[in-house]
A protein has these predicted regions:
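A glycine-centered loop/beta-turn motif at secondary-structure junctions
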Residues: 487-518
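Beta-strand->loop->alpha-helix junctions that form or flank phosphate-binding loops
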Residues: 232-239, 325, 478-481
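Cysteine-nucleophile active-site neighborhood
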Residues: 18, 22-26, 30, 342-432, ...
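Conserved small/polar residues in nucleotide/adenosyl-binding loops
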Residues: 532-535
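Flexible phosphate-sensing "switch/lid" loops adjacent to ATP/NTP-binding sites
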Residues: 1-320, 330-342, 349-350, 357-363, ...
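Catalytic beta-strand/loop cores that center a nucleophilic Ser/Cys/Thr
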Residues: 437-492
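Short, hydrophobic alpha-helical segments
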Residues: 227, 259-269, 389-393, 519-527
């Protein structure tokens, strides 16, 4: 029978419940258990795909095409388990399903209420992902005390009652703030948070204390006493420089030991040598590479979470340190990139910042600075090449302008922006890509066909492929039917490669995405080359 672990948060949001859940998944998998992670999000949006990146961060795409919370990216990167759409559940999707069933008459005229109908649907979604795994870790988003998460907490409480104490446990992540003027660490917020959680009928089995420093035994003893949790089940999780150090820190604090004991998992010690060996590569890195992300969603760094993590993975693999810089495409200046070792132009939507990206890509192309384009980055590269190499001065995308006849980037044939469900109408999920032989891309992937995740509705217009190819642009990756351009590249350049897909979603710390890996190799080897001076 599957064992269930619910992870809740208290005091403030953004404490790292996702990293805690991912780290626990890592440790349990290292104990030879089969695991799966899940995120319950309390917002009313059915999916996060149309949410503002400044508010929500990036949208993570799963293999089966679900647009999900960015925490699923953490889960996959820490555990290596590819998740499905049922790994992310929102309040909006729950209510929509219940209302649909009510309209069909499935409730036989009953008065539809939060309890039992909403909570029953939540429980169905929680249980529906497990299949035959040993342990399921379900993170409940939000903060205890928020009105939005009450149905999720009630559903979790009912599950412990229905499945038994031995099969369901709760981990509560809280904050122990340091008060500067009095130089004290305060446990009162944690005590109040646990008290509130108990008011909902849930007593945490383990409390994870987030802090900006290591906590002494007195603090842990105090929390143990006032929150009625055994001392060994009070886990200190101080801030660390690298999130990939968290699993080892959690292990040293005894998190997986406490879970193993509480759920009677009867497992051996975790095998963590591979993870330790991966982290040891950081100590062998002596050279810095200056890489910039040229984008437009900089109000929240999480907007490009998977891109940043993929760069870290590649740097780790190549024994170099990442010196990451951020360049706003709205305020781009050539001086910003003239001394860089490489630039990534990631995905995005809308016309804002586009001309800055196109101008920057021209500079990168002409000055032989390594360039990696992703999704929108590929589209901007094609527009730049069409304008400045092919002589199509009005080249543009139909997404950005309707005042031109030269749409080198246009809607996919099956796309319809007038559809009611705009977000779900994109080309989403894993699709095959046929690699062109004797290209840089073929060296990167070493496979004739690869499978990568997509999230787009615009593509290279096939009407312009011939003129682009005649002028030197290489289509190094195509859909199996040759109708969609998946990758482009240039010869006689250290690295000028772009993809319509999102390689960052499949990158792992121990196995970097091949495109990012080659990009960092090129950036490191092309340092100190002569470049055009900026006036």
């Amino acid at each position: 029978m599957t064992k269930y672990i619910f992870v809740t948060g208290g005091v403030v949001s953004g404490l790292g419940k996702g990293i805690t859940s991912a780290s626990l998944g890592n440790l349990l998998k290292s104990r030879s258990l089969t695991i799966v992670n899940q995120k319950l999000d309390p917002y009313i949006n059915v999916y996060p795909d149309t949410m503002n990146p400044f508010q929500h961060g990036e949208v993570f795409v799963t293999e089966d095409g679900a647009t999900t919370d960015l925490d699923l990216g953490h889960y996959e990167r820490f555990t290596g388990v590819n998740l499905r759409k049922d790994a992310n559940v929102t309040t909006g999707s729950i209510y929509r399903k219940v209302i649909e069933r009510e309209r069909k008459g499935d409730y036989l005229g009953a008065t539809v209420q939060v309890i039992p109908h909403i909570t029953d649907e939540i429980k169905r979604r929680i249980k529906g992902i497990s299949n035959d795994v040993d342990v399921q870790i379900t993170e409940i988003g939000g903060t205890v005390g928020d009105i939005e998460i009450l149905p999720f907490l009630e559903a979790a409480r009912q599950m412990r009652k229905e499945l038994g104490q031995e099969n369901v446990m709760f981990i509560h992540v809280t904050l122990v703030p340091f008060i500067g003027p009095s130089t004290e660490l305060k446990t009162k917020p944690t005590q109040h948070s646990v008290s509130m959680l108990r008011g909902y009928g849930i007593s945490p089995d383990i409390i994870v204390l987030r802090s900006d420093r290591k906590l002494d035994e007195d603090i842990k003893n105090k929390v143990s006493l006032f929150c009625d949790v055994s001392y060994e089940n009070v886990i200190n999780a101080p801030d660390l420089d690298d999130i990939y150090d968290v699993p080892l820190k959690m292990h040293s604090e005894g998190l997986d030991v406490a879970v193993n004991k509480r759920l009677n998992l009867n497992t051996e010690e975790p095998e963590l040598n591979e993870w330790k060996n991966m982290l040891s590569l950081k100590k062998e890195s002596f050279k810095d590479v200056k890489i910039a992300i040229l984008g437009k969603y900089f109000g929240l760094p999480d907007s490009y979470m998977s891109v940043v993590e993929s760069l870290k993975h590649a740097c780790l693999q190549n024994n170099v340190n990442l010196d990451l810089q951020w360049i706003d495409a709205d305020n781009y200046d050539a001086e910003d990139i003239s001394n860089l070792d490489g630039v990534v132009v990631p995905g995005g939507f809308g016309v804002r910042g586009i001309e800055g990206k196109i101008s920057a890509i021209q500079y990168l192309r002409e000055n032989k600075i390594p360039f990696l384009g992703i999704c929108l980055g590929l589209q901007c590269a094609v527009i730049e090449y069409a304008r400045n190499v092919c002589g199509i001065s009005e080249a543009n995308s139909s997404e950005f302008s309707q005042n031109t006849k030269d749409f080198v980037i246009d809607l996919l044939p099956n796309q319809d922006l007038d559809k009611d469900d705009v977000g779900a109408s994109m080309r989403l999920g894993t699709y095959p890509c046929k690699i062109t032989k004797n290209t840089i891309t073929s060296e990167i992937y070493k496979d004739e066909v690869i499978y990568e995740r997509h999230r787009h509705r615009y593509e290279v217009n096939n009407k312009y492929r011939e003129v682009l190819e005649k002028n030197g642009l290489i289509f190094s990756g195509l859909s199996p039917d040759n109708n969609l351009v998946e990758m482009i590249e240039l010869k006689d350049h250290p690295f000028f490669v772009a993809s319509q897909f999102h390689p960052e979603f499949k990158s792992r710390p121990w196995e970097p995405a091949p495109m990012f890996n080659k990009f960092i190799q090129s950036a490191a080897s092309s340092q100190n080359t002569d470049r055009k001076s900026v006036v």
